[in-house]
Amino acid sequence: MEVQLGLGRVYPRPPSKTFRGAFQNLFQSVREVIQNPGPRHPEAASAAPPGARLQQQQLQQQETSPRRQQQQQQQPSEDGSPQVQSRGPTGYLALDEKQQPSQQQSAPECHPESGCTPEPGAASAASKGLQQQPPAPPDEDDSAAPSTLSLLGPTFPGLSSCSTDLKDILSEAGTMQLLQQQQQQQQQQEAVSEGNSSGRAREATGAPISSKDSYLGGSSTISDSAKELCKAVSVSMGLGVEALEHLSPGEQLRGDCMYAPLLTGPPSVRPTPCAPLAECKGSLLDDGPGKSNEETAEYSPFKAGYTKGLDSESLGCSSGGEAGGSGTLELPSALSLYKSGALDDVAAYPSRDYYNFPLALAGPPPPPPPPHPHARIKLENPLDYGSAWAAAAAQCRYGDLASLHGGGAPGPGSGSPSATSSSSWHTLFTAEESQLYGPCGGGGGGSAGEAGAVAPYGYTRPPQGLAGQEGDLAIPDIWYPGGVVSRVPYPSPSCVKSEMGPWMESYSGPYGDMRLEPTRDHVLPIDYYFPPQKTCLICGDEASGCHYGALTCGSCKVFFKRAAEGKQKYLCASRNDCTIDKFRRKNCPSCRLRKCYEAGMTLGARKLKKLGNLKLQEEGEASSATSPTEEPAQKLTVSHIEGYECQPIFLNVLEAIEPGVVCAGHDNNQPDSFAALLSSLNELGERQLVHVVKWAKALPGFRNLHVDDQMAVIQYSWMGLMVFAMGWRSFTNVNSRMLYFAPDLVFNEYRMHKSRMYSQCVRMRHLSQEFGWLQITPQEFLCMKALLLFSIIPVDGLKNQKFFDELRMNYIKELDRIIACKRKNPTSCSRRFYQLTKLLDSVQPIARELHQFTFDLLIKSHMVSVDFPEMMAEIISVQVPKILSGKVKPIYFHTQ
């Protein structure tokens, strides 16, 4: 026989109540009660007529042993009325049940043979309609049974409606007996000090004081220790106890029981304590009774999904009323979150779509049933995707979702003529996984004849026959014929994404509005996607306005004016990555000034605004005048603008974000060896790669690209960028006599031979000498380096090829503007542009040779003891083979 270990002592369990596991105890007992209700329910006893109850009581008293009769003592209630404390047939103390008001019994029933006389408080109890609970016939002697949860009735009234089997499970051995002596002392002190009426009545009648009286002190309240135990029992059973803390016992907080019976309603709608198990499980998933409608509306899809399989089941319960009647309350399966009746007037937000889930609903959601006036269960309304679906569709990547909302625009699948022609286009995904783009965001009401209509980006939609194919997408080899490109011919893909992801961050420079083309159709106003900024772009403090070309606060405005106009050079004491916020903006002036430049601040912003106004004014005067001085006036205006643009904001940003000097960590005291030199080069490459990523993310317009395109462009162009930057350092530091990889790693002729890459080093030194021969200026170097980032792409194209092409062309225009800044002769500008573009083309063959060298070195690195950092090894092993196999090719300006 198995035994249960309680807090008090070891006591035997009935054989039928032996379980293994806490949750198995709970659900198996509940299942047994549902299947075999038995006569243990208090309703079964209360529904019997008074005569039958009297006969049953007489029979029970005759069969009760003398020792058992001594244990069944009468206990006065708070108002002095006697109550009988009985034990259930399983040998455990039962919970005190709430006595139903009865009009059929006017006096306390007492068997004439027992010789009991009614106490003085009995008459008052009878007048109030209270009745005694008859004792249940015992199965065995249970004098050692614990009196645990029978003491918790006044504090946890919700448990009073639970079944007897559930009470048996909750009645563990001697849980409250540890505190019984302390409570008895407290009760004695309270009895002496207070001298309540119930105590005087017991002393007058000489009635013995029951164990419950001695524990509770004749009142319905319990100590803090008992409350803590009550909370522990409730938490172990998955019950919400938050509501018990702020409500007094007199408020009768019903419905917080595990099965949530609606005891606050009229008797006709009160369910039985034995609610279905599905409702019990559903209630355990909720957060508790203290949640508001607005908070729980966010998680309604998840709760509705859990109870989806229970939609066909009725979760209502029936019970007997006061006069033996019964009623049924039907509740939907999603009604599992409790709330008080005071919160019923709080409006939920059924149309709010927090997670932008594109759920396709077959029809409008059914209206929820009206809540019961006394019900304490929150009615969860399904998500309403009617009028609010337009806002959700506008945030999706694919424009065709905008036609799904109920705003009056027909779309595919809505019964319009376009439903047939667009049936092969899924609303969320393309027909084939290999397609690069999704459905373009045109109007929802097109027909089959409008398949070639112009999309927002100028792309055309293919006819129905090509809907599931690549459309008229050009062959990748035709994009860059012969590896030469002047202006990339745009293909006409079947569809294009309308990317509006978080990577498309706004930039206040000249390319900040690049993504806001006037041809793009927005479902909602542009302010919906880009809310007006109200914080300083430098420190995050409250912005006072647009100062020097950026939205900043007054402090950063004054700092930039003084720092930009002053002659003082700021140096960062750290690694040029200090945190600049409201509280630490004064710690590092160097990083603060760099962040100002990154935000687009410049001293000429005010002058540019004045010149722009002057230009508009002069153009207006020139258009209205008919004098022969019209042409000279226009030339004068252009000359003023071009003269100012010799120092554009673009160059200020490039100068501010240029990475600093990176050391390789090479030990020059050790003798040079192949493994040591190459390991130091690999370590330097990984360190520089981190700076390249930060530099690229700060470039104007770079984040307008798709996030996958950003990663691809950096992984393909990192070698060319490092070679180009190393050539510039060699030119400026050692006059191109040696290769200046890092201050602690400079390659001379000996190291070039020792590294076994002499031919590659010679070509890199020749590139460095080109900077001196062509007299490259720092402004030209910065722009060429930025353009080199956008000079190699996959043959199949990027995910957002149009943005990439526009960004590359804008950088080419910036380079041409820098060239034309100091040259007035167009022929000289063209010659200079030719020289610089030829220099850019010469970087690609060098980078390809280095790609081949590093890939071969990685394969045999374990043989030559050369260390490869993890990030470098991953890029070389994954991305470099694509370049060597021809899947990724550079973009040349001239024929090779």
From Swiss-Prot:
One of its GO terms (cellular component) is chromatin. Residues 548-638 are annotated as: Interaction with HIPK3. InterPro entries: Andrgn_rcpt, NHR-like_dom_sf, Nucl_hrmn_rcpt_lig-bd, Nuclear_hormone_rcpt_NR3, Znf_hrmn_rcpt, Znf_NHR/GATA. GO terms for molecular function: androgen binding; beta-catenin binding; DNA-binding transcription factor activity; estrogen response element binding; nuclear receptor activity; steroid binding; transcription cis-regulatory region binding; zinc ion binding. The modification Phosphotyrosine is found at residues 215, 259, 299, 338, 349, 354-355, 385, 511, 528, 892. Residues 190-199 have a biased composition (Polar residues). There is a cross-link at residues 378, 497 (Glycyl lysine isopeptide (Lys-Gly) (interchain with G-Cter in SUMO)). Residues 1-534 are annotated as: Modulating. Residues 528-895 are annotated as: Interaction with LPXN. The record marks 697 as: Interaction with coactivator LXXL and FXXFY motifs. Its main location: nucleus. GO terms for biological process: androgen receptor signaling pathway; intracellular receptor signaling pathway; male gonad development; negative regulation of extrinsic apoptotic signaling pathway; nuclear receptor-mediated steroid hormone signaling pathway; positive regulation of cell population proliferation; positive regulation of gene expression; positive regulation of transcription by RNA polymerase II. The record marks 874 as: Interaction with coactivator FXXLF and FXXFY motifs. Residues 535-608 bind DNA. Composed of three domains: a modulating N-terminal domain, a DNA-binding domain and a C-terminal ligand-binding domain. In the presence of bound steroid the ligand-binding domain interacts with the N-terminal modulating domain, and thereby activates AR transcription factor activity. Agonist binding is required for dimerization and binding to target DNA. The transcription factor activity of the complex formed by ligand-activated AR and DNA is modulated by interactions with coactivator and corepressor proteins. Binds DNA as a homodimer. Part of a ternary complex containing AR, EFCAB6/DJBP and PARK7. Interacts with HIPK3 and NR0B2 in the presence of androgen. The ligand binding domain interacts with KAT7/HBO1 in the presence of dihydrotestosterone. Interacts with EFCAB6/DJBP, PQBP1, RANBP9, RBAK, SPDEF, SRA1, TGFB1I1 and RREB1. Interacts with ZMIZ1/ZIMP10 and ZMIZ2/ZMIP7 which both enhance its transactivation activity. Interacts with SLC30A9 and RAD54L2/ARIP4. Interacts with MACROD1 (via macro domain). Steroid hormone receptors are ligand-activated transcription factors that regulate eukaryotic gene expression and affect cellular proliferation and differentiation in target tissues. Transcription factor activity is modulated by bound coactivator and corepressor proteins like ZBTB7A that recruits NCOR1 and NCOR2 to the androgen response elements/ARE on target genes, negatively regulating androgen receptor signaling and androgen-induced cell proliferation. Transcription activation is also down-regulated by NR0B2. Activated, but not phosphorylated, by HIPK3 and ZIPK/DAPK3. In the absence of ligand, steroid hormone receptors are thought to be weakly associated with nuclear components; hormone binding greatly increases receptor affinity. The hormone-receptor complex appears to recognize discrete DNA sequences upstream of transcriptional start sites. Transcriptional activity is enhanced by binding to RANBP9. This is Androgen receptor.
